[in-house]
Amino acid sequence: MMVRKGAATKAPQQPKPKAQQQPGGRRRRRGRSMEPVSRPLNPPAAVGSTLKAGRGRTAGVSDWFDTGMITSYLGGFQRTAGTTDSQVFIVSPAALDRVGTIAKAYALWRPKHWEIVYLPRCSTQTDGSIEMGFLLDYADSVPTNTRTMASSTSFTTSNVWGGGDGSSLLHTSVKSMGNAVTSALPCDEFSNKWFKLSWSTPEESENAHLTDTYVPARFVVRSDFPVVTADQPGHLWLRSRILLKGSVSPSTNL
């Protein structure tokens, strides 16, 4: 081929290098940086019977404390000779020996679970029945017979020798399907209410409305059978879980 004089000649162009390919014809991707990224980590909350404490997420919310599920001995089921008098137990953190010191460092509390479990310690030949229930208003009179007792909240009754399978409830949150005698406070009614924390025993002259500000309920237990000789046919156990709120000096709750 002839080339014209004076015409610029172009050097042959070299082919551009192709990107290195992996098997399959795909282009190798650029790797990501493996440098650690600083991110806030939220620790997992404890569950079960572990005691839990924390601070509210919203500014201005007081510190709180969750006791988790706790089993406590409430007392013996006593029957007085010749009478059918009732035993009355105040629903209060004062009944919880394991958290008494901690509870005194808070101003308010709320029951999340409050269940009484009766365990018999008498023979099946023992006469009489046990009656259990709660009074939600401190102005309510303590029942003196089965008719008035039956109108109490979460009323339950059984032979005094019944309820042997309730012992399984003291070690698990699973409801026993066997022979258990229990009475549980309807704590859902207090889901939006806090009670003042106090170790004081309500006085007879105290206004009932004032008492209701720190005592959500009373647990009542009685026998329908007047025994000749005083006895103790069984024991009362408490399964509870409470919330505490508002840090204060422990000396405030004496």
From Swiss-Prot:
SUPFAM superfamilies: Positive stranded ssRNA viruses
Keyword RNA-binding: yes
One Pfam family in the UniProt entry: Viral_coat
Region annotated Disordered, chain positions: 1-53
Function in brief: Capsid protein self-assembles to form an icosahedral capsid with a T=3 symmetry, about 30 nm in diameter, and consisting of 180 capsid proteins. Each icosahedral unit contains three protein subunits (Potential).
P domain, projecting as annotated region, ranges: 246-254
Native source species: Cocksfoot mottle virus (isolate Dactylis glomerata/Norway/CfMV-NO/1995)
GO cellular component terms, semicolon-separated: T=3 icosahedral viral capsid
Subcellular location(s) of the protein: Virion
Keyword line: Capsid protein, RNA-binding, T=3 icosahedral capsid protein, Virion
Biased composition (Low complexity): 1-24
Region (R domain, interaction with RNA) location: 1-61
Family in the record: Belongs to the icosahedral plant coat protein family.
Region (S domain, virion shell): 62-245
InterPro entries per the UniProt record, alphabetical: Capsid_prot_S-dom_vir, Viral_coat
Cysteines paired by S-S bonds: none
Keyword RNA-binding in record: yes
GO molecular function, a single term: RNA binding
Annotated protein name in UniProt: Capsid protein
PROSITE patterns: ICOSAH_VIR_COAT_S
